[in-house]
Amino acid sequence: MNPVPAQREYFLDSIRAWLMLLGIPFHISLIYSSHTWHVNSAEPSLWLTLFNDFIHSFRMQVFFVISGYFSYMLFLRYPLKKWWKVRVERVGIPMLTAIPLLTLPQFIMLQYVKGKAESWPRLSLYDKYNTLAWELISHLWFLLVLVVMTTLCVWIFKRIRNNLENSDKTNKKFSMVKLSVIFLCLGIGYAVIRRTIFIVYPPILSNGMFNFIVMQTLFYLPFFILGALAFIFPHLKALFTTPSRGCTLAAALAFVAYLLNQRYGSGDAWMYETESVITMVLGLWMVNVVFSFGHRLLNFQSARVTYFVNASLFIYLVHHPLTLFFGAYITPHITSNWLGFLCGLIFVVGIAIILYEIHLRIPLLKFLFSGKPVVKRENDKAPAR
């Protein structure tokens, strides 16, 4: 075990929480966007579609960089087996808890909302399995990907640590140009792999478990490893926390390219491959934009911020079925898209916070939704004075 910095990275905690909570306006705006979802408003909103595309273009790339950063920090804190156990418990237990308590009821509700309940018995065994894979994993996909990444990084992090012991890490130099070229090549590599699969056996791309375990892991693993490297090399971390006009401009241009691909691309042609290349480099540049912004404005301790940092995972887990309920039963009664969007935010966030406060008072639920054992403090046992 190696010592780890004692100073808390408040801005990274805050960014991770905000990225998680951005899932709420992302999914609510999806109802009012031009993208087809489980539930949609009668008429799409151009501006809410643009807002939805903006969040979707970079959010998870930056999230996985932060996850990799904190994962490697814990890797240095614990023995290898304990590290894997702690990491898998913290993401795996909430995921397994949310499936029967959240995504299964959500799936049943959608079966009736979309009028598919009657056709369910006629589906083949594989179609039932694949539908359940997509619908029960649902918005929990990133937790499954984190479990897979953690398992892979048992070997990857060991290799990184061993290489560091045999080299001088102070001489390692990074530049955004080099990183951009690397991530461009990674994006092209991912696109080639996806295209090859599409040519050889296209049905596998519609398999839910293959998509989550293989394709999503393959795309986001470079960002996870980049986060670990940012923890190891202060120069790399400083590269991300220092504002860069070049990164901001490049990210803006990449987002325009992303929108053009969404508008004019075709799923039967090269739209998905082009998107993977664009979002790979866009994600890298947005790491600089988000980190530098967060380092300047969010690097402080606050009771209110700490509350939402602690609550962000639970709120994210419960927001999805609440959003779909709102979209199915309340959205049709609100004629204004923007009013519906704001009402959706109030509805979902308000109920999610109430549920969070309730679950804090039930030790079993608190454990199941956090993956952390409830530790009773000695102060709690002291008699009142």
UniProtKB/Swiss-Prot annotation:
One biological process GO term for this chain? glucan biosynthetic process
Q: Name one GO cellular component term.
A: plasma membrane
Name where it's found.
Answer: Cell membrane
**Where does the chain cross the membrane?**
17-37, 60-80, 91-111, 137-157, 173-193, 212-232, 239-259, 274-294, 311-331, 338-358
Q: In which pathway does it act?
A: Glycan metabolism; osmoregulated periplasmic glucan (OPG) biosynthesis
UniProt keywords, alphabetically: Acyltransferase, Cell membrane, Membrane, Transferase, Transmembrane, Transmembrane helix
Q: Indicate where this protein is primarily found.
A: membrane
Q: Where is the signal peptide?
A: none
The role this protein plays is: Necessary for the succinyl substitution of periplasmic glucans. Could catalyze the transfer of succinyl residues from the cytoplasmic side of the membrane to the nascent glucan backbones on the periplasmic side of the membrane.
HAMAP family tied to this protein: MdoC_OpgC
Protein's name in the database: Glucans biosynthesis protein C
